[in-house]
């Protein structure tokens, strides 16, 4: 184990032989870890609430900051996955958040891949989302199984009840205005950017379906 910084890995039970290969660098980095293996924690307050966890990577101030019992999460960036698992000891697994505030509001969601600043920043209990690009899918809270790739893709999608959206938006501003529509495939810059509540649409090409706001199928 390697601990560098005030209170880094300060709670780790080194008398237990299995607690090995942990690295924590920064003030209070991994400060609450009692049982853990192969965690890499770098940054002030990074994973500072984690008690039991394995093979997590947290890099950046307050990255994975409130996770208590998760494993195999990757959080890179200021407050990335910052509130994951807050208030619960139930384990949350396999989330990837890379970029400032990426997935910062996730509490119990799992298997999300969020790459880019502000990506999926409002998601809480949501699963299986793939989000790449600055500000992509930033307002949705409970939507699952969305794919948003590109600057501000699915920018306004927001399901306030648990919903499998199955929306796919790829391109600059693709699906920009979609709020509660489902099963849409929008590929190309500004594709379906005016669509709001329409469902079951396919739009491929620059500005395809860019003036329809409510249409379905």
Label every model-predicted segment.
Residues 1-217:
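Glycine- and small/polar-enriched repetitive beta-structure motifs of secreted/surface proteins
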